[in-house]
Each structure stands twice: as structure tokens, then as C-alpha cells.
A protein has these predicted regions:
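Acidic catalytic patch
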Residues: 42, 63-85
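Donor nucleotide-sugar recognition loop
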Residues: 88-90
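Acidic, PIN/NYN-like endoribonuclease modules and their adjacent C-terminal/linker elements
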Residues: 98-129
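Alpha-helix capping/helix-boundary segments
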Residues: 9-10, 40, 72, 96-97, ...
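Short, well-structured N-terminal submotif of metal-dependent ribonuclease cores
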Residues: 1-36, 45-61, 129
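Nucleotide phosphate-binding site architecture
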Residues: 10-11, 42-45, 117, 124
């Protein structure tokens, strides 16, 4: 399984919360691939504490990182537009992450499922944080 880690999970791993580091280690041992997006990396750096820099770099180096392509951008924009027409406001960041997960056929690992209403998405069932 290819897991796409959302920012909430990345932060939990780096701040040693909720046993997320151990969970990811177990998933890797079981043969799963861990990835994130360049957008999640930007969000992580935006809130990073100075003392977390080395640990953050080391952790991110161990992950695959998916970029935003023109095709992904079109899908993300279409998703945002589709839900806006239904009266649901989604952030562009979340629609980009969703589009990458859909295009790359990744299972999304997030604490914020409510931000990702797309039925095309598969989610990893995280234990309660």
C-alpha cells in the first residue's frame, strides 16, 4: 500500500504524538510505501520549530515526495469548483492533496477526514488521536 501522509500526521510524528512514529515504522516493516506532497512539506516548514529542523529533514528524506503537476492542478481546481457549487468550501491545499492521492492511487493518512469529502479517496483508519 502507498500511504500519503497529510500534514497532521507529519506533525504528530515529528512531535512524537499519539504513537504515530511507531505506527509508521510498523507500516514500513510490513512493506508499505510512505509519501507526502510538496505542499505538505511547505505547511510543515511554515510551522516548524527551530529545534525540529534536523529531525524534520531526516524524516522527510525517508519519504517519497509528490509534486504538483498541471494535470493534478486541473483535478484539484475541478474538485474545489465542484464542491463550491454544492455550497462546500474546501481549501485549495486540501484539494491539491486529494488530487495527488487520487492520481497516485494513494491511501490518505490524515486526522482531518472532514476536509476530504471526495468519495474517490481511500483513507487509512488511524487510531483516535
Amino acid at each position: 500500500m502507498r500511504l500519503l501522509l497529510d500534514t497532521s500526521v507529519l506533525i504528530d510524528v515529528l512531535r512524537l504524538r499519539h504513537g504515530r512514529r511507531e505506527l509508521l515504522a510498523e507500516l514500513v516493516r510490513a512493506g508499505n510505501t510512505l509519501a507526502t506532497t510538496a505542499l505538505n512539506v511547505a505547511e510543515l516548514y511554515a510551522g516548524m520549530r527551530p529545534e525540529e529542523e534536523a529531525r524534520t529533514e531526516s524524516f522527510l528524506d525517508a519519504l517519497d515526495c509528490y509534486e504538483l503537476t498541471a494535470a493534478t492542478g486541473r483535478l484539484a481546481g475541478s474538485l474545489k469548483n465542484k464542491y463550491a457549487r454544492r455550497g462546500r468550501t474546501l481549501t485549495l491545499a486540501d484539494t491539491i492533496v486529494a488530487a495527488i492521492a487520487i492520481e497516485r492511487r494513494c491511501t490518505l493518512m490524515t486526522d482531518n477526514r472532514k476536509d476530504f469529502p471526495m468519495p474517490e479517496l481511500d483513507f487509512y483508519d488511524l487510531p483516535e488521536a
